[in-house]
Amino acid sequence: MRAGLGPIITLALVLEVAWAGELKPTAPPIFTGRPFVVAWNVPTQECAPRHKVPLDLRAFDVKATPNEGFFNQNITTFYYDRLGLYPRFDAAGTSVHGGVPQNGSLCAHLPMLKESVERYIQTQEPGGLAVIDWEEWRPVWVRNWQEKDVYRQSSRQLVASRHPDWPSDRVMKQAQYEFEFAARQFMLNTLRYVKAVRPQHLWGFYLFPDCYNHDYVQNWESYTGRCPDVEVARNDQLAWLWAESTALFPSVYLDETLASSVHSRNFVSFRVREALRVAHTHHANHALPVYVFTRPTYTRGLTGLSQVDLISTIGESAALGSAGVIFWGDSEDASSMETCQYLKNYLTQLLVPYIVNVSWATQYCSWTQCHGHGRCVRRNPSANTFLHLNASSFRLVPGHTPSEPQLRPEGQLSEADLNYLQKHFRCQCYLGWGGEQCQRNYKGAAGNASRAWAGSHLTSLLGLVAVALTWTL
């Protein structure tokens, strides 16, 4: 049944009211202490030694690679083969570790997690970002479409094999129940276990939450970027996941179809807004930090994002109040001298100047509007306002030695700049601070909240034994 106009309007009103209300405090920045972190997680480590093309990445707060063989990084990605016994079907359709989650063994999976985590994150300190990248199936049954339908088919077959006399509708309902229950147990208890092993890290699943707003392909002329109402409701079905996560990692990879169009900003904006909505909804006293995955290039080929699309991705994410962006890439980005040279030129000419601009603009806004105890968030999420350094007030100057910043701003905020920030942005305070400009110190209360937050990591293991004992092998 198609949703009517009434529910859509109601949802829109709820979202606007939620945005207009007081922002919950969030975790303080990690790594550099900046309100907006920019991370480079692209496997370009071979550009210098193999292809003789060194890349200057000093402007990034974090440098890491998602490739195998690298440990103790500030950002760690756990793919399906790096964390326990993730049930899935491979590309040939062969069942691996049971295929569907209800056919997997949580009893065998959980004990392997400690070894997996300690292999890639070898020390407790310092904290970092830990991203679980499990994309083979989705925990909401109806979202397993197209090539993921194999998980629904297999689930139905398992039920039908046990109950050959059941009608198809009963088989389907039971299959959905068993799949969603098992998927929840696998994801939930994995999160609980790994948080207990490395409690200083911020843990979450890549691409959660998703917005499913890719309908620009079919509806280019009428495309708005809004998340379908039904998908927002389905995200709320995952309240158990958001309650256990300590960070959210949505993705805003741009297809070249969207290049430099008004749709690119709408596509990104509503995906980030949905993540921020989820971040504020499922914890009573704090909001989860949101780190947005993006790419330095469009999803097909090696064409760097245009200036317009850098604003639509990095700039939009910063203005909406995300904690940072993570640039991800694959081995093709550094597969030859030509690709490395292209990235080198792109970094120097376009990407680095822009991220330095935005990073410092968010920092200045935090200092002047939030006493350095919070990050600036756009008052109107739909407004065409950004955290950019005013070219009339600042210029970027290069460092002259490797120990100096790659680029740094020179200048100061004008009265007009300060008025602009005050008019268009408000503060989201870090835990321990409150007030309109984060001027009130609540660190005693925040300490209790932080201990409760961290304590949930340590106590979560208590429930795992019971789950494991009742798991159907």
Swiss-Prot record:
SUPFAM superfamilies (UniProt xref): (Trans)glycosidases
Source organism superkingdom: Eukaryota
Signal peptide: 1-20
Assigned GO CC terms: apical plasma membrane; cell surface; cytoplasmic vesicle; cytosol; endocytic vesicle; Golgi membrane; lysosome; membrane raft
Catalytic activity from the UniProt record: Random hydrolysis of (1->4)-linkages between N-acetyl-beta-D-glucosamine and D-glucuronate residues in hyaluronate
PANTHER family: HYALURONIDASE, HYALURONIDASE-2
Name the record gives this protein: Hyaluronidase-2
Record organism: Mus musculus
Biological classification of the source: Eukaryota, Metazoa, Chordata, Craniata, Vertebrata
